[in-house]
């Protein structure tokens, strides 16, 4: 059975709507996509691209280029590409929550999300740190953020934290939870019976035997040894500056990084256009683009849909496995 997936464009003034319109030009045999978006914004995006879009009822199949089933989410004000309005923050969140509700009730089997502008959501009076955190809270379960491309998969112990707060957030419980969720997802979603997971140290040179920090000795190594006893194939703690060398990456199925900018620069450098953001641990697959709203590109017909296409293809595969 072909899975039904929500397609949520994110910030309406960014490139998300036009990427969705571009995606609709190629009907997919692997998924039934339903956009959770404002219809006027999608029509405006199509006009800016000189493309056609035909918005269908959610249950209607997309058969021709430009067909896009729609669950309408009305905005408070009309979209001006490149100029986000906090008045539309509630509609952005409503689209995400509506899609999540449909997955939790079994009406849909996954969510593909476009980029959201955190500052605009907060300016609209809605506390928001990220879609990963919002969906985790909505589902009531712990999750892990993983970024992936064709070369490497990187899971994060901490996500959107100031650097000065990272060390305090690296606890035995947090690391163990991240590793357990990552291990389970690699087995269930990626079909790896015995996934090989590399664990990075927090400090330079993985602490250098305590000389450059004790987190490896006091937290990371004890957790790794405990989970190895449970049967997990864990490698580390590894110094982050050499863990991503090509000759080493072939020995890992995933890398667990301690913080956002430890693991993601290498991934984005190695294949930014095809990179995607996967939320591990949810009761349904959620895959997002790995780029921002790109307000400066919105409406200019130059935004690259590669990440959204990759996210949609992966979400369809993950949904089919469940």
UniProtKB/Swiss-Prot annotation:
<keyword id="KW-0664">Pyridoxine biosynthesis</keyword>
<keyword id="KW-0963">Cytoplasm</keyword>
<dbReference type="GO" id="GO:0000287">
    <property type="term" value="F:magnesium ion binding"/>
</dbReference>
<dbReference type="InterPro" id="IPR005255">
    <property type="entry name" value="PdxA_fam"/>
</dbReference>
<dbReference type="GO" id="GO:0005737">
    <property type="term" value="C:cytoplasm"/>
</dbReference>
<dbReference type="GO" id="GO:0008615">
    <property type="term" value="P:pyridoxine biosynthetic process"/>
</dbReference>
<feature type="binding site">
    <location>
        <position position="132"/>
    </location>
    <ligand>
        <name>substrate</name>
    </ligand>
</feature>
<dbReference type="GO" id="GO:0042823">
    <property type="term" value="P:pyridoxal phosphate biosynthetic process"/>
</dbReference>
<feature type="binding site">
    <location>
        <position position="268"/>
    </location>
    <ligand>
        <name>substrate</name>
    </ligand>
</feature>
<feature type="binding site">
    <location>
        <position position="205"/>
    </location>
    <ligand>
        <name>a divalent metal cation</name>
    </ligand>
</feature>
<keyword id="KW-0479">Metal-binding</keyword>
<feature type="binding site">
    <location>
        <position position="160"/>
    </location>
    <ligand>
        <name>a divalent metal cation</name>
    </ligand>
</feature>
<dbReference type="GO" id="GO:0050570">
    <property type="term" value="F:4-hydroxythreonine-4-phosphate dehydrogenase activity"/>
</dbReference>
<comment type="pathway">
    <text>Cofactor biosynthesis; pyridoxine 5'-phosphate biosynthesis; pyridoxine 5'-phosphate from D-erythrose 4-phosphate: step 4/5.</text>
</comment>
<dbReference type="InterPro" id="IPR037510">
    <property type="entry name" value="PdxA"/>
</dbReference>
<protein>
    <recommendedName>
        <fullName>4-hydroxythreonine-4-phosphate dehydrogenase</fullName>
        <ecNumber>1.1.1.262</ecNumber>
    </recommendedName>
</protein>
<keyword id="KW-0521">NADP</keyword>
<dbReference type="GO" id="GO:0051287">
    <property type="term" value="F:NAD binding"/>
</dbReference>
<comment type="function">
    <text>Catalyzes the NAD(P)-dependent oxidation of 4-(phosphooxy)-L-threonine (HTP) into 2-amino-3-oxo-4-(phosphooxy)butyric acid which spontaneously decarboxylates to form 3-amino-2-oxopropyl phosphate (AHAP).</text>
</comment>
<feature type="binding site">
    <location>
        <position position="286"/>
    </location>
    <ligand>
        <name>substrate</name>
    </ligand>
</feature>
<comment type="similarity">
    <text>Belongs to the PdxA family.</text>
</comment>
<keyword id="KW-0862">Zinc</keyword>
<keyword id="KW-0520">NAD</keyword>
<dbReference type="Pfam" id="PF04166">
    <property type="entry name" value="PdxA"/>
</dbReference>
<feature type="binding site">
    <location>
        <position position="260"/>
    </location>
    <ligand>
        <name>a divalent metal cation</name>
    </ligand>
</feature>
<dbReference type="GO" id="GO:0008270">
    <property type="term" value="F:zinc ion binding"/>
</dbReference>
<keyword id="KW-0170">Cobalt</keyword>
<dbReference type="GO" id="GO:0050897">
    <property type="term" value="F:cobalt ion binding"/>
</dbReference>
<keyword id="KW-0560">Oxidoreductase</keyword>
<comment type="subunit">
    <text>Homodimer.</text>
</comment>
<keyword id="KW-0460">Magnesium</keyword>
<feature type="binding site">
    <location>
        <position position="277"/>
    </location>
    <ligand>
        <name>substrate</name>
    </ligand>
</feature>
């Amino acid at each position: 059975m072909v899975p039904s997936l929500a397609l949520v464009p994110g910030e309406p003034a960014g490139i998300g709507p036009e990427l969705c319109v571009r995606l609709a030009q190629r009907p997919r045999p692997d998924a039934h996509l339903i956009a959770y978006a404002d219809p006027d914004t999608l029509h405006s995006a199509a006009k800016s691209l000189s493309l056609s879009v035909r918005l269908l009822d959610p249950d209607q199949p997309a058969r021709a280029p430009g067909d896009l089933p729609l669950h309408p989410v009305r905005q408070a004000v009309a979209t001006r590409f490149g100029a986000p309005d906090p008045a539309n923050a509630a509609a952005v969140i409503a689209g995400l929550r509506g899609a999540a509700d449909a997955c939790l009730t079994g009406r849909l089997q996954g969510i593909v999300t476009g980029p959201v502008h955190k500052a605009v959501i907060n300016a609209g009076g809605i506390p928001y740190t990220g879609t990963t955190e919002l969906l985790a809270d909505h589902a009531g379960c712990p999750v892990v953020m993983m970024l992936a491309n064709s070369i490497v998969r990187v899971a994060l112990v901490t996500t959107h934290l100031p650097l000065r707060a990272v060390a305090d957030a690296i606890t035995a419980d947090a690391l163990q939870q991240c590793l357990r969720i990552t291990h389970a997802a690699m087995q269930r979603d990626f079909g790896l019976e015995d996934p090989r997971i590399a664990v990075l140290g927090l400090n330079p040179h993985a602490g250098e035997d305590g000389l450059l920090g004790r987190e490896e000795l006091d937290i990371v190594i004890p957790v790794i040894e405990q989970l190895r006893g449970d049967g997990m194939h864990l490698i580390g703690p590894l110094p982050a500056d050499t863990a991503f060398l090509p000759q080493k990456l072939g020995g890992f199925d995933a890398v667990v990084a301690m913080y956002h900018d430890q693991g993601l620069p290498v991934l984005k450098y190695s294949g930014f256009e095809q990179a995607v953001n996967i939320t591990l641990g949810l009761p349904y697959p959620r895959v997002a683009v790995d780029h921002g709203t790109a307000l400066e590109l919105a409406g200019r017909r130059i935004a690259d849909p590669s990440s959204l296409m990759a996210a949609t293809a992966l979400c369809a595969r993950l949904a089919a496995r469940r």
